[in-house]
Regions:
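Conserved redox-cofactor binding core of oxidoreductases
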Residues: 125, 130-215, 220, 227, ...
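Glycine-rich loop(s) and the adjacent beta-strand/alpha-helix scaffold that form part
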Residues: 223-278, 282, 440-463
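An anion/pyrophosphate-binding glycine-rich loop and adjacent beta-alpha core
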Residues: 251, 258-392, 463-466
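Conserved N-terminal glycine-rich FAD pyrophosphate-binding loop of Rossmann-like flavoproteins
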Residues: 67-100, 266-270, 278-281
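Glycine-rich Rossmann-fold phosphate-binding loop(s) that bind the pyrophosphate
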Residues: 42-45
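Core beta-strand elements of the Rossmann-like FAD/NAD(P) dinucleotide-binding domain
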Residues: 34-36, 214-223, 425
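Glycine- and aromatic-enriched mobile tails/lids
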Residues: 19-20, 25-28, 32-37, 50-53, ...
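Helix-loop-beta segment of a Rossmann-like dinucleotide-binding subdomain
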Residues: 108-112, 145-169, 232-236, 363-377
Length: 648
């Protein structure tokens, strides 16, 4: 394992770094690739695209999916679009502008070189997906259509109505299936990685649980790729699929992979508000809706009270009595400010008492102006399925009344630390997509998650991993009877036995919900020193309750979702604590991390570049010992660092 953080960022001009790095990387002869085995954990956009591409190159790939099909990956839930710098709208977009918007949107807490590479390969992603048959929306003349997303002033987002993630995943899934049929990829559905196996300091395999039979199984390889997404479900209520978890990444952390910027969690501004105590998941309404929808609350408190009592409808409030607060506060960007800015603005209005539902935690997203301007057919073409989804959930038609929305946990910018090659601090272990921290800094721009996942999977990892594997083809296949596999399996079995032995009375979900309440209260949209210290204490207290009183019914050797959830909750406790610890250490406000002690007179985020312009990479020590913080300084040579301004 590396003794310090070596990012491997090439020297030279920004636009030449990726080309230079590719020229330095070693290659693997096509005939030697078939001698090499690669494990890919996760089958969302990052994992599916990586496995398909590596298989097509001739490597022997084993791909693992916790669901019955890659089509169930959470990538399928992405709605609004994918960014690419193609300048199809002739609005002065460019690779540099996408790079600049991403750095600025991330509040100057991401690497220049990684972000520029992401922008550089973005156009190739669209070409690849079109070749796969992804049905992107098109203009009248047949050209691919674009729309805008938050934090930008150009239209660079390619989309397929409100189902972009689904269509992109089907394209990657088709490519993956082709390689499965060709025999280069072996698929393991309903398998969950529970530990990473290290031999001689290198990642050599995993221990996975067959979720159908309950059996622990061993898998060896020359390299391991983690593509399991983020850890947003630490909060219990989030927009993530309920199966989404951070356990695979967390087990890598506990085996020596540094975990970077865990406190950077994104809160999405356009989600359907919480409906009641029994809710276990939140529903995202696409950011694309902010293209044409206008966000507002009433100006008069009397109107707010009437709305809460259902005495009036939103459409009955006159235009002059509506506060379009984003347009008022940020005239240059209006409703298309970045997500962290829009979320805090909604919280501010609701905290001031202007929330429009019974709980006081909702604002309006109104399409009446767009319907008048564009007509019913155009709006239906762009947002029809989203309108239908909202109606099915709320029994309110967005054609007649505004949607009600409120911020919710959505994405995590933090993740496993990786270098420029996407390799972690453990040789042979790579992390891609949302599982790593690489590209988004303190806040991700909308439509950039799909871009990063496919960039890593199609165009970056297949090139960089060859450098590591170039001298491995002469090595024998990993022996799964190695003592390291014995120990890893024994450790996993001990975790399972411990959970079954508790025989308590509280359900896993009830305890997870309490953890989520702690996280949302103290590590949510507004954080303070006092609250974060309280969070760490309460998380550990709740963890003690879990190990004393949790009930895990059933048996190991059967389909047992309660056991699955209990194993993940063990990790969520530790992830939540590290998030709070990282947030406590970062005594500044930047992106999705907002410390109440560090804000301007107007309530905007106040960065501390002198003390916190670095990537915080945490190293696990051992149980009961605090992790060690390593700092990777961030240097900006090709962009001017300044306070984000979305007002003019």
């Amino acid at each position: 394992m590396a003794d310090k953080l070596i990012s491997k960022i090439p020297d030279g001009p920004l636009a030449e770094k990726w080309t230079k790095r590719k020229s330095e990387l070693r290659l693997v002869n096509p005939n030697n690739r078939r001698k090499l085995e690669i494990i890919v954990v996760g089958t969302g956009l990052g994992g599916a695209s990586a496995a398909a591409t590596l298989g097509e190159l001739g490597y022997n790939v084993k791909v693992f999916c916790i669901s019955d099909s890659p089509r169930r990956a959470h990538s399928i839930a992405a709605q609004g679009g994918i960014n690419a710098a193609k300048n199809y709208q002739n609005d002065n977009d460019a690779v540099y502008r996408l790079f600049y918007d991403t750095i600025k949107g991330g509040d100057y807490r991401s690497r220049e070189a990684n972000v520029y590479r992401l922008a550089e390969v973005s156009a190739a992603i669209i070409d690849q997906c079109v070749a796969q048959g992804v049905p992107f929306a098109r203009e009248y003349g047949g050209y691919l259509a674009n729309r805008s997303f938050g934090g930008v002033q150009v239209s660079r987002t390619f989309y397929a109505r409100g189902q972009t993630g689904q269509q992109l995943l089907l394209g990657a899934y088709a490519a993956l299936n082709r390689q499965i049929a060709a025999g280069t990829v072996t698929s393991y559905p309903r398998h969950e990685m529970l530990d990473l196996v290290i031999i001689d300091g290198q990642a050599k395999g995993i221990i996975a649980r067959n979720l159908v039979t309950g059996k622990l199984e061993r898998f060896g390889a020359h390299a391991v790729v983690i593509a399991t997404g983020g850890y947003g479900n630490t909060y219990f209520l989030s927009t993530n699929a309920m199966n989404s978890n951070g356990s695979a990444a967390w087990q890598c952390y506990k085996k020596g992979a540094y975990f970077a910027n865990p406190c950077f969690a994104q809160i999405h501004p356009t989600c359907i508000p919480v409906h009641g105590e029994q809710q276990c998941k939140l529903t995202l309404m696409s950011e694309s809706l902010r293209n044409d929808g206008r966000i507002w609350v009433p100006k008069k408190m009397e109107d707010v009270m009437k709305l809460r009592k259902h005495e009036i409808k939103p459409s009955q409030i006159p235009e002059e009595d509506r506060d379009y607060y984003l347009e008022r506060r940020y005239p240059a960007f209006g409703n298309l400010v970045p997500r962290d800015v829009a979320s805090r603005a909604a919280k501010e209005r609701c905290d001031a008492g202007f929330g429009v539902n019974e709980t006081g935690l909702a604002v309006f997203l109104d399409f009446s102006d767009a319907i008048k301007r564009l007509g019913h057919q155009r709006v239906q073409e762009r947002y029809g399925n989203l309108f239908d989804m909202y109606f099915k959930i709320n029994n309110v038609s967005p054609w007649e009344e505004p949607m009600m929305i409120y911020p919710a946990i959505h994405y995590t910018m933090g993740g496993i630390w990786v270098d420029y090659d996407l390799q972690t601090t453990i040789p042979g272990l790579y992390a891609i997509g949302e599982a790593n921290f690489s590209d988004h800094g303190g806040n991700r721009l909308g439509a950039s998650a799909l871009m990063q996942g496919l960039a890593d999977g199609y165009f970056v990892l297949p090139i960089t991993i060859a450098d590591y594997l170039s001298h491995k083809f002469a090595e024998p296949k990993t022996d799964i009877n190695n003592p390291a596999f014995d120990k890893a399996e024994k450790d996993v079995q001990a975790r399972i036995d411990r959970l079954f032995a508790i025989k308590g009375k509280q359900t896993v979900d009830s305890i997870h919900k309490k953890l989520g309440n702690i996280m949302w209260e103290y590590v949510g949209m507004a954080r303070s020193e006092e609250g974060l210290k309280k969070a760490i204490k309460e998380i550990n207290d709740l963890k003690a309750v879990f190990y004393k009183d949790v009930c895990v019914p059933g048996e190991q050797y059967q389909f047992n979702q309660e056991l699955e959830k209990a194993l993940r909750l063990e990790d969520f406790f530790e992830i939540g604590e590290l998030m709070a610890r990282d947030a406590l250490n970062r005594n500044e406000s930047c992106g999705g991390h907002f410390r109440v002690e560090s804000q301007t007179e107007e309530g905007e985020a106040k960065r501390d570049d002198a003390n916190y312009m670095y990537v915080a990479a945490w190293e696990y020590k051992r149980e009961g010992q605090e992790p060690e913080l390593h700092k990777e300084p961030l240097k900006y040579e090709f962009i001017e660092v300044k306070t984000r301004n979305y007002k003019d």
